[in-house]
Amino acid sequence: NIEIFQKIKKKIFPFYKNKDLKFVFKKLQEDSSNQSIPAKFVGGCVRKYLSNEDIDDIDIATSLTTDKIKEKIKEKKFKVIESGIKHGTVTLVKNKLKLELTTLRRDIKTDGRHAEIEFTDNWLEDSKRRDLTINAIYLDINGKIYDYHDGARDLKTNVVKFIGDPNTRIQEDYLRIIRFLRFAIQYDS
């Protein structure tokens, strides 16, 4: 869609001028085939971008493991915070830039708050474990949107809904009901 691409180019590409962010994407892309894009923006930064809101946090989903991420970015002297290493999450900090990178994963078992996970390289599988359609929209470094659950449409029409069965989503993590209510109020759904 040309209109969406023009919006992305206008709003996000100036954001890509950050040399450290470009470095991270370049390093994560190394050794991958042209068919495979190993890192994409996801969650709040994509949702806020599509809603023309200020982006205050940057989440990146990746098919790479945390060890591989740390190895690839070591030359740039990021502060690496192992914020959720057992769940595949590292936070990279440099100057005012803070990036949270999480390995693609799927839930194996949940207890209402914490999940036992398994890493995957499947973007659709990763998207299915997210809470809301508007938080499961991916955006690659080239501005292409990957939207497996019609989250962009829901965002445009101010619809806040769970991915799949709401009861299942809430049983997996009880905090999701609070997030749902927060977004329903925010987007006046």
Describe each model-derived feature in a short phrase:
Residues 1-189:
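Catalytic cores of the polymerase beta-like nucleotidyltransferase superfamily
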